[in-house]
Amino acid sequence: MINKINYSPFIAVCITALLLFSCSGGKWQKNVSDHEYNSYYSGENLDRIAFPIGGMGAGMFCMEGTGAISHMSVQNRPEIYNEPCMFAAISVKGIENGTKVLEGQVPGWKKFGIPNSGNGSAGASYGFPRFENARFLARFPFAVIDLHDNDIPLEITLTGWGPFIPTDPDNSSLPVGAIEYSFKNLTSKDVEAVFSYSSRNFMSQPNGNNRIKELPEGFILSEEGVKNKPESAGDFAVFTNEPGTQVDYCWFRGGWWDPLTMAWNTIQKSEYKTNPPVESRAPGTTLFVPFTLAPGDTKTIRLMIAWYVPDTNLRYGKDSEEVENEVCEDPNCSCNLPYYKPWYSGKFAGINEVVNYWKTNYEDLYRKSALFRDVFYNTTLPPVVIEAIAANLTILKSPTVLRQPDGKLWNWEGCSDNSGCCAGSCTHVWNYAQAMPHLFPSLERTMRHTEFYPSQDKEGHQTFRSALPIRPVATTFYAASDGQLGGIMKVYRDWRISGDDEWLKEIYPKVIESINYCIKTWDPRSTGTLEEPHHNTYDIEFWGPDGMCSSFYLGALKAISEMGIYLNEDVSKYEELYKKGREAMETYLFNGEYFIQKIMWKGLNAPDPEIRFNDPNNNIPEEERKLLIKEGPKYQYGTGCLSDGVLGTWIGAVCGLDNIVDSVKVTSHLKSVYLYNFKKNLSDHSNPQRPSYAMGDEGGLLLCSWPKGGRLSLPFVYSDEVWTGIEYQVASHLMMMGETEKGLDIVRACRDRYDGRIRNPFDEYECGHWYARAMSSYALLQGYTGVRYDAVTQEMHIDSHIGDFTSFISTETGFGNVGMRNGEPFYDGAFGEIIIRRFIMN
């Protein structure tokens, strides 16, 4: 008898594979996420979620997609892998398997391959029972987690948050957070249960003196510090709003895993202990809230968290020999501090004051933060746009941001795993960040003060990395062309947002010093372009005029002319340079499709780079000399299509400076960027630089490509990478120019990479976590709707390519919803007041 083989399943598989292959343009279709934009995360999309909770410049902790606490960064620096053993639990009396940690299942990536996992993850709470299912919803600054388990007859919701109130920077800079645990009885009987919250004293330091202190309805994890290390001292408080809270201030003291074992034994029995505090070295603590729920009833337990770490060892920057008295006239100025101190250390004397303020003002701060949430999410904008903007507002709550006692901001570019990354409120990175100037304009203006006063010398040279504490800093390195010229445009923007003429009058002379330095240094022959080598955000110097930095130059010239005319100043010099530069950019630097760079390295004021090879002490390899002679200086882009190639016109547009360069040619450049640099699949893309931003079957926008040839052997050092901050910049600019769908394509590709499976949706990284450039995403509001408020003229501008819409706007004095209904503009105020004399419809 011959066996018959059924080939039907095999044929079906082959046909399916061929269809997938053909429908993906010759690429195997990627494993697309089930996550819908601006909606719930569940399943594997929970794995990498870590949502920052804290205050601006105050530190943070993160609420993970499961409900776990991690990234505990309250010691004035990031601690990305600091996941202390702290957890909430519920124990329902009288049922089997009724005790569980109030979290979803531990993600698989934590079980093996991370530090300590090879030894079994000792000391973590991973081994305790958890809920079968979880789902996570971000509604910044709130994160909501629903937990479900067939063993537990309760509907359970966790809500984590920290105060965030646009126009109220102080209450948005508090070292606090909260998690509300809500329980609803789904049965027809009373449910008796005990809620608990447990923690080791993760504030303790080696050779320090740590204690767990008493606090009404809670506890304080305390470290008095290590000798000669005041920055090691600090307090972390956890407390509830429940008068019946019971606290065990000292777990069982023993070896091995005795303390955690005994603590869990108590929790598991639905019991509680009330051990008093001990003098030192208590291994851990647990608070308990026993409660009874009638059928259908709901109980919410408010868990409030506060911390106080007043000292640091942070100091950056070389002191300037030029010290202007005007910088330090203010007795509250932080410039004379030996080390940085956080803003809250000047407002509160200790942890008890923070606790009292948080407890007293909790409901008011919740109401105002929830108002912002509700107004922001009351929108008709595409979900992917709202997700992108809101996800990157978390940067403001991350350790990327610091704030001095005098109120001034100082920022990193991003966060390395255990320290800030790239110091000094770097001007050419923070150029892109558009959230702060609209949500907290007064804080943003402190950055202008830093740039144009302590960071600018008498010649007008601006150090693009300011000192910490903020003080006069030596200008011994190159100025950054894009950073310094962008700062001039940002002065214009901040003036139009605030409407503060006196502020403009005061800073304008410093702005004149700055532009004159730029002209003298980079355009000494008055061509209207930057010919001399000019440092920029790619951490190299461009030699010869290029579209990117020349567009900054034109924007700065136009900004200073507009401000000068308003102040009745003579700006004819700048107007003439602008005209010459615009003509040069639109002809000499435009190849008919996009803007390019004309590489120059001979006949400049700058020394010929070939001279370096004549000095034997430089010890430069021979192959580098040959490459210079063949191609010119390293790290240029030449004939390339640069995604940032008209960046200055985008900065100008978000600042309210329109038509800096011919809009038809700008649009042509942006469409070329979309055509040549946007890749839906990067599998065949070669990147010897930093590939993990986007790689393999992921999509993304490359920084540069050379569609017409001419790629140099060593183009600028990041040219093959994908940066989210540039993706949003290009996307919002495309939208402004009427190419809305192309912009949305780029935003979707970006957010698809940050869907929680591989990357944290709330941590867009570049040179570090929570990278500031990603706040270019805030410009998507203006890009999609054309909404911009001018406080000088009290006019609301709307340039809608989409018809009727509802969106969000925040200004110096308030926030609300803005849009069009039946073709007519409207503004619905929610907080504060925005005076609108008239709407300008473009």
Residues covered by each model-derived region:
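Non-catalytic C-terminal accessory modules of carbohydrate-active enzymes
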Residues: 57, 68-70, 76-158, 163-169, ...
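C-terminal substrate/ligand-recognition segments
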Residues: 178, 289-294, 301, 422-429, ...
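Aromatic-rich carbohydrate-recognition surfaces in CAZymes
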Residues: 91-94, 98-102, 110-121, 185, ...
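Acidic/polar, glycine-enriched structural segments that form the non-catalytic walls/loops
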Residues: 27-34, 40-45, 49, 144, ...
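Beta-strand-rich N-terminal accessory domains
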Residues: 26-109, 388-392, 397-399, 404-405
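Extended glycan-interaction surfaces of carbohydrate-active proteins
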Residues: 382-416, 442-475, 521-545, 586-723, ...
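C-terminal motif of bacterial Sec signal peptides marking the signal peptidase cleavage site
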Residues: 21-22
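Bacterial N-terminal signal peptides that target proteins for export
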Residues: 2-11
